Amino acid sequence: GGKPRDVELKALFRIQGPKEANSGIQFRSKVRSDGFVEGYQADIAKETRFFGVLYDETPKRGLLAARGQRVVIDEAGARKTEQFADENELWKKIDLDGWNEYHVTARGFQVAAKINGHVMWEVTDREKDRHGDAAGVIALQLHVGPPMQVQFKDIRLKVLTEAK
């Protein structure tokens, strides 16, 4: 249980199935009364557009950062995006048929992720009434769709505390 705010999460994962297969690791998220989990999602997919991106399952947010992007979201929700690495080169660092490691860090308004040691995205999210620095649940997603298999192992969570 619990709803950590500042965390470092590492997990090995693999996804098998058709190109529509989709999953993710949700963090700083909330569970709605209908069971749907909304919030940040470090995305996992068989299709290039979504694998290794930061998606927000909250209505009206969607894709926050593609692979290789550094995004700053201000209090009004305006986004400033910088491409720090080629998304196709980062795509080549992912093993589509084997195990990969996600390493997600959330501290204050900043969230970032690596896959297999390569930085995929960095986001500073200060949008008002969102979850940029909120505490929330961690969840593993199996997306609706055709038959697929998603496996996770060696999940490690470290709750980060501020230095006193």
Predicted regions located by residue number:
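Carbohydrate-interacting regions of secretory-pathway proteins
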Residues: 1-164
